[in-house]
Amino acid sequence: MSNTSQKHRDFVSEPMGDKPITALAGIGEVLGGKLEEQGFDKAYVLLGQFLILRKDADDLFKDWLKDSCGANSRQADLCSSCLKEWCSSFL
């Protein structure tokens, strides 16, 4: 039995394309709205930030997510894990 959400599994199961920011696990309407206000309107835009900040230290991305849109630790973990798994499959 998997411990990831259906939202996570759906996101990592296919190429990202033009998916909205809210398609990412851990990002709902409220956080998505805050990120959109900062120009992060699509999942691929947030992926860019993830790749810039990550480089084998995803705590930087999680901290940035908490600071930039008020994500809590669980939301930041879910989003980071989702992007990390997507990268493993598609990059």
From Swiss-Prot:
GO process annotations (BP): chromosome organization
Entry keywords, A to Z: Nucleus
Residues forming coiled coils: none
SMART domains the UniProt entry points to: BAF
GO molecular function: DNA binding
Chief location: nucleus
InterPro entries: BAF (IPR051387), BAF_prot (IPR004122), BAF_sf (IPR036617)
Name listed for the protein in its UniProt record: Barrier-to-autointegration factor-like protein
Native organism taxonomy: Eukaryota, Metazoa, Chordata, Craniata, Vertebrata
Superkingdom of origin organism: Eukaryota
Assigned GO CC terms: condensed chromosome; nucleus
Assembly with partners or alone: Homodimer.
Subcellular location: Nucleus
